[in-house]
């Protein structure tokens, strides 16, 4: 089975920014990485308009089935008081559970300078393909139909018809 990927985009209200980042780094990421099947977790600052989800998190999974495991569901359904406070205050929250389709079982590039999340059809433009290493994911929940996560090596033009989210290490 292919690896899975969980993508989240979150944004706290401005007055909670410091607390939100402390919670994410000190509690949330270690908690998720302690769940069997979570392979890696990285946070990114997204280059988006206010209210669209300032922070992108990428969680690589052994498989998409990790998100239905008893260990994951226990954490998801029993959040800590700090998790309830921080997530409950978010002005933006988006979540995608995906199956990695390309290149299958490859892991994340540990030195990616940035990532680009493209929602929609996979771009065919030559300059995009030359600028990035792409991994494509199918969303089993049906929306968006395809998500492509690019690890950027060079500036990337915005292909027509796609919603693009650029993100940089936090």
What are the language-model segments listed below?
Residues 1-170:
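Macromolecular interaction modules
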């Amino acid at each position: 089975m292919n690896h899975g990927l969980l993508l989240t985009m979150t944004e706290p209200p401005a007055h909670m920014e410091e607390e939100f980042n402390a919670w994410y780094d000190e509690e949330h990421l270690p908690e998720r990485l302690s769940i069997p099947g979570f392979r890696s977790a990285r946070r990114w600052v997204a280059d988006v308009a206010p209210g669209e989800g300032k922070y992108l998190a990428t969680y690589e999974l052994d498989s998409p089935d990790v998100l239905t495991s008893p260990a994951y569901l226990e954490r998801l359904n029993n959040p800590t008081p700090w998790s309830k406070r921080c997530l409950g205050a978010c002005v933006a929250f988006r979540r995608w559970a995906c199956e990695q389709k390309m290149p299958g079982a490859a892991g994340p590039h540990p030195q990616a300078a940035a990532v680009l999340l493209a929602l929609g059809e996979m771009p065919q433009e030559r300059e995009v393909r030359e600028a990035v290493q792409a991994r494509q994911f199918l969303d089993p929940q049906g929306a968006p139909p395809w998500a492509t996560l690019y690890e950027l090596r060079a500036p990337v033009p915005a292909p027509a018809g796609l919603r693009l989210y650029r993100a940089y290490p936090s």
